Amino acid sequence: SVGFKAGVKDYKLTYYTPEYETKDTDILAAFRVTPQPGVPPEEAGAAVAAESSTGTWTTVWTDGLTSLDRYKGRCYHIEPVAGEESQFIAYVAYPLDLFEEGSVTNMFTSIVGNVFGFKALRALRLEDLRIPVSYVKTFQGPPHGIQVERDKLNKYGRPLLGCTIKPKLGLSAKNYGRAVYECLRGGLDFTKDDENVNSQPFMRWRDRFLFCAEAIYKAQAETGEIKGHYLNATAGTCEEMMKRAVFARELGVPIVMHDYLTGGFTANTTLAHYCRDNGLLLHIHRAMHAVIDRQKNHGIHFRVLAKALRMSGGDHIHSGTVVGKLEGERDITLGFVDLLRDDFIEKDRSRGIYFTQDWVSLPGVLPVASGGIHVWHMPALTEIFGDDSVLQFGGGTLGHPWGNAPGAVANRVALEACVQARNEGRDLAREGNEIIREASKWSPELAAACEVWKEIKFIFPAMDTL
């Protein structure tokens, strides 16, 4: 008899293997699957495993030239999603040999490359990935990580403060540098290029880099603190991006920035390697993430994009505020904040963490809280994010009625007051407003900020629920 039989057969015969014991070297994925009406969940889960590994839509004779059992993805468990009709979590195990070492690009091309357009599925979302130790070890990861950054900046025991320079588009380089200087002089640790500031006609990158470097050095000399500005090196080509990073290094500034989703993982990993080799910190902005992660039943959850960034490399990444103008539910946000910072994270479904993740000492990433936050949020932010974070107030600094430097002073005073109160054992969640009010008695800048923003709230329900 001939070993090869042409024709189309059910995926579940080959790719649904509930008896499979996962290996320590497997990459594990949890997908939220919404099958088309009439498609059984086992078939849908198996289809995902097949299409994201070795399968194709029909039997091919070349299957006989390899060992499918060694290379195929396997759907090893399926569970219904509580409270949702015809939605399932499908767990898929991928053998390590399917992936190129040290390439987030290849990992994503395999796992989420083709399968999301699959007709048998109404919707598909990648909820979480377990990256095995053996694969983690093929990545450099963040250029420096949390501890090295603190040592470089000589700042300990508190969150770091930042500010995005606004208006984000239209300032000349000289005026932009002036705004940077005012913020840093007032007491911020960092200022930031907006994610869409690259090199436009009103402000070319080289001019901006130069004036920002001048602002940094002037502010450092006046305050005796180390300062930084996230110089956005994102560009249309990798060569141009590297040219900008090299110029930043020549200026002697401490940190550059990249938009990792629009710039792409290949560019990001290249830049991260350069940053480690040349002592630059790397700030990562997640522009475009909501296109991918905001829909509850289709796309990729941000915790996966956050894990991917830790592998590709970045020292800071924007990760929601829980309290400001942008999306973020508290437990889920803290779940991926832990995935960014900690070395070992236990599985915890209540926070959306589907797998235990061991990073085997890959450096951690500082989460950046940014978007619609101001001094009244400071106690909550200090309590939620703790010391290892960057709190970024754009409008919450520049919108101060007396200008940028007083806005920066207000934020720094509020932060120091919250850290001191916490260290004295006070409850920031309960006494937060009182702590800010007390501090504003001896800081007119803070008092003015408190007055301006006392009524501002962004109250909408979070979409990112379990």
UniProtKB/Swiss-Prot annotation:
UniProt cross-references to SUPFAM superfamilies, sorted A to Z: RuBisCo, C-terminal domain, RuBisCO, large subunit, small (N-terminal) domain
Cofactor annotation remark: Binds 1 Mg(2+) ion per subunit.
EC number per UniProt: 4.1.1.39
Subunit structure and binding partners: Heterohexadecamer of 8 large chains and 8 small chains; disulfide-linked. The disulfide link is formed within the large subunit homodimers.
Lineage summary: Eukaryota, Viridiplantae, Streptophyta, Embryophyta, Tracheophyta
Compartment list: Plastid, Chloroplast
Keywords on record: Calvin cycle, Carbon dioxide fixation, Chloroplast, Disulfide bond, Lyase, Magnesium, Metal-binding, Methylation, Monooxygenase, Oxidoreductase, Photorespiration, Photosynthesis, Plastid
InterPro entries cross-referenced by the UniProt entry: RuBisCO, RuBisCo_large_chain_AS, RuBisCO_lsu_C, RuBisCO_lsu_C_sf, RuBisCO_lsu_fd_N, RuBisCO_lsu_N_sf, RuBisCO_lsuI
GO cellular component: chloroplast
Cofactor(s) it depends on: Mg(2+)
UniProt protein name: Ribulose bisphosphate carboxylase large chain
Task of the protein: RuBisCO catalyzes two reactions: the carboxylation of D-ribulose 1,5-bisphosphate, the primary event in carbon dioxide fixation, as well as the oxidative fragmentation of the pentose substrate in the photorespiration process. Both reactions occur simultaneously and in competition at the same active site.
Gene symbol of the encoding locus: rbcL
Chief subcellular location: plastid
Amino-acid positions noted as binding Mg(2+) in the UniProt annotation, renumbered to this chain: 192, 194-195
GO biological process per UniProt: photorespiration; reductive pentose-phosphate cycle
Organism: Berzelia lanuginosa
Active-site residues (renumbered): 166 (proton acceptor), 285 (proton acceptor)
